[in-house]
């Protein structure tokens, strides 16, 4: 079990190492704590290796107490791998790339690295919020068609208990967040700036509403970090990496939203796109993504759900080699299996939905939704307010 490090050490590393760092992740994987790594950076220890040059210009920016105070003043907390609510199950299998082009694979893998800390405003249990989530992205100059499609798809996804994740930008991002809020679905804004900055400023009321409704604003960047162009590209990898799939609603040929789709493809996530009119410039990027098999064409929320649920939580090669039909549990999605494992066997008692949700680490809304679906399929049974397996 890894030693728990101080928030000050994580805050220091967040300040002096911008964005993802493969070197920090390697140290953590090899048993180094954030306290040790921070001390090594501060003292320029020889063992930090490549982390030395990476922090050469910033290691004296030693202000963790001030950063934590500034974050608190802006309503943010620092979430780390030591924190309850850290979305480890989403992060562990995600941040690596699979690209046939070796040069491109190397380039992507330099940035396809998990965050070492996240600054969060609102609901800090990201593990629960992201357990069933989809990224919804698209152009800043949405057409009426794009607006309508986004609203319709998000409302449909809400019925499947999805958390809607986007970047808070104008256009499709904004519509996705608004639609989620309007129908009571949780939503997460992944920001390209640090606490203390609101970008775009016109969306400040929307972001406040996201937090009040039980969602969250999430960023890798420490307080005062400005929303520069390169940070949007780095932010896109988080939208792709933290969710089970990415939906591209409307995007022109060089739309920045295509960068998020690229990340999702590289991370072997489900990538989906909404087809648009062949005469519409705003849909050229989405149509080409479908044509080039970079995204599956989807027409409604049920199709999106089908793609994500059947991504498979087992290795595809192993599935192909199965000699016999899958067992009941092998047919369950990851979240369904979490619920199933939290249930007593038939004849061995029963549990309330609240107890099951707590044990499974899911929200009560998502847990009840899954229980009802499993009941329809004859997998679980309900006796008054309590549930158990059917076998």
Please give the residue ranges for each predicted region:
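Glycine-biased, small-residue-rich flexible motifs in mid-sequence functional cores and linkers
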Residues: 1-7, 15-18, 82-391
